[in-house]
Structure formats: structure tokens, C-alpha cells
Amino acid sequence: MSTLFIISILLFLASFSYAMDISTIEYKYDKSSAWRTDEEVKEIYELWLAKHDKVYSGLVEYEKRFEIFKDNLKFIDEHNSENHTYKMGLTPYTDLTNEEFQAIYLGTRSDTIHRLKRTINISERYAYEAGDNLPEQIDWRKKGAVTPVKNQGKCGSCWAFSTVSTVESINQIRTGNLISLSEQQLVDCNKKNHGCKGGAFVYAYQYIIDNGGIDTEANYPYKAVQGPCRAAKKVVRIDGYKGVPHCNENALKKAVASQPSVVAIDASSKQFQHYKSGIFSGPCGTKLNHGVVIVGYWKDYWIVRNSWGRYWGEQGYIRMKRVGGCGLCGIARLPYYPTKAAGDENSKLETPELLQWSEEAFPLA
């Protein structure tokens, strides 16, 4: 075995080991000193590339992405050197400009949202009334009603992931079965929405109702591209969907106390792109462009499930500050939830893979 080969193996193993612990590098920045050297940034860049299996088309693209990475790292360092309620860090999107990030990963269509706001029936089921005795805290992950975090990839299908997540949860709450369902079926078959180019929750819910159910992820796996609609089983069904009273965080809290709810938010800021941990407090606007799911709350924040994989945020989650009214990033402007009768036997048919919940699978805030 050649010496060169042995050295190559050792370098690979070393880079792999460092990449797995890249978080220890992220915050070694002291604002009182000069910023990182190019050599230090290049080392961090190489470790980050290894961790996320990034491969570029050539040297020109590699250098272009390095410059973007360097700018983002400086932005992250400067934020973390100040007094904030949350930290930013290296995410899978640190080699993207904010404009590129928005174009690829934000997929809730604001044009559709504005049309639907005038037509959707808002339920008074979760209208907040003085004297309502709500739990001080709730976390549906702890109750085994949430599947592991998923990853939408380079496809603007957040609308499908957030809708499916709430259907998975209400099905578990009503039947006791936690089943991972198919986002790809919605991307391929829900023609009122736009596949990887965005969509709306209500059209996704209506498709599941009209279709008589939705298939499992195992039967109809995710591809991150829109393809032809193919035959699918009707494993889990819902009865309907309702809107929570708009711009009322107390009503939203009441809804989440009963079941996870889908919401649209403004996720376009650089701070959101690079969020790593803590209670996110902005900045952000109220232009709704990304679908997520509220799976719980604490006294001053929401526990929000994203669909960008476990390397973003707190293992795929973000804690967002509760501010009242329409909420931070517009989180209370357009909340919905699916409805399903208790004891619906349909969701117990043809379900070969029930998920076993374990606390290790979820980073509890």
C-alpha cells in the first residue's frame, strides 16, 4: 500500500471527524480582534463541504461559493458577537446568497394566499374566550404525534411537507398510529398547486379529501422533483380542514393545544436562513412565503417544525418568539388544521410501517 494512499485515507478520516464537529468552530470569533484569516475561513469551508457532501461543477463555481460562504460567515460571526436571543450558524445554505436561498427554498405562493383569505371558512372551534384554561406548555413530539424531521431539498414544496405533517399528527392523535405519509404524491398529483414552484395548504387538504386519502412515504417516496401522478393507496384520510381565527395568537395557542397546526410565515431573512439555536426574534416581515408547522409552545415561544432537514436550526426545529397579534413573521395570519373523526378505521388499513416514537428522535426544546 503506497504512502500517498495512506496519507489520503488519513486526511479523509480527519476531515470527516472534524466535519461532524464543525459546530465547535463556528463561534470562535471575538469582535475585539481582527476577523478570521482567509486560511481559517478556507479550513472551515472545506469541513463544511465535507459535512454536507457539497460538490461543485468546477473551480470557478468552487471559488464563487467560497466568497459567498465567507460573506455569510462574517454576517453570522457579527450577529453572534452581539446580544441576541438566538444564535446563527453554518447551515446547508451558507454557500447561497439570500436571493438564491429564497428562490429555491420558499414555496408558499402569496398570490394564492391573498385569493384564499377571502374564501376560507374560519372555524370558531378555537376562538379564544376569557377564562379558557389552556396548558402552560405543550409539545406534540413528546406525545409521539410527530414524525422525524424531513427535507424538501431543492424544491419549493414546503406547502406539501407542512400539510402532510399536520395530517400525520391528527391521524396519530385520533387512531394512535404514527405513519409517515407521502409529500411526493401531493407534488405530483395535486394539480391546483404548483409542485416544486409553490402551493397552498387548503388545496393540499382538499386534494386529500377528494382523493379519499393519501399514501405512505414508503409506498410513494419523495424525489424533490415533480413527476407524473401515479397510482397510490388511500392509507390515511381526513374529514376536512378549518382556519383558526386570523391574527389571534391566543386562538392559535388554543388550536395547538389540541393538535399541530400549519402556518405560513415570512422566512426570507438572512437571519432565518442561518438560524441555529435559541428563541428567534427576527427581523422578518409579514410576506407569507414558507409553510411550517407549530408542534407546541412554551410561555414565550412557539415550537416550529421546518422541512429543511436536521442540519438547519435545532435539529430541524426553530423556537419563534410569541409577540401577540399577527405574530412574529406573520405566524398567526393564516393558520389551518385538518379535521378527522376519532376512531376512523380507514387509517388502520394497509399500514405496514408504523413509526415507533423515541425521545432520541426529537430534540426537545
Curated annotation (Swiss-Prot):
Single GO BP term: proteolysis
Active-site positions on this chain: 158, 290, 306
Regulation (activators, inhibitors): Repressed by the active-site-directed cysteine protease inhibitor E64 (L-trans-epoxysuccinyl-leucylamide-(4-guanido)-butane) produced by Aspergillus japonicus.
Top-rank taxon: Eukaryota
Record's signal peptide: 1-19
Residues that bind E64: 158
Chain's role: Cysteine proteinase. Hydrolyzes denatured natural substrates such as casein, hemoglobin, azoalbumin and azocasein with a high specific activity. Has little or no activity against synthetic substrates.
Family as reported in the entry's similarity comment: Belongs to the peptidase C1 family.
Listed name of the protein: Ervatamin-C
Organism listed in the record: Tabernaemontana divaricata (Crepe jasmine)
Lineage: Eukaryota, Viridiplantae, Streptophyta, Embryophyta, Tracheophyta
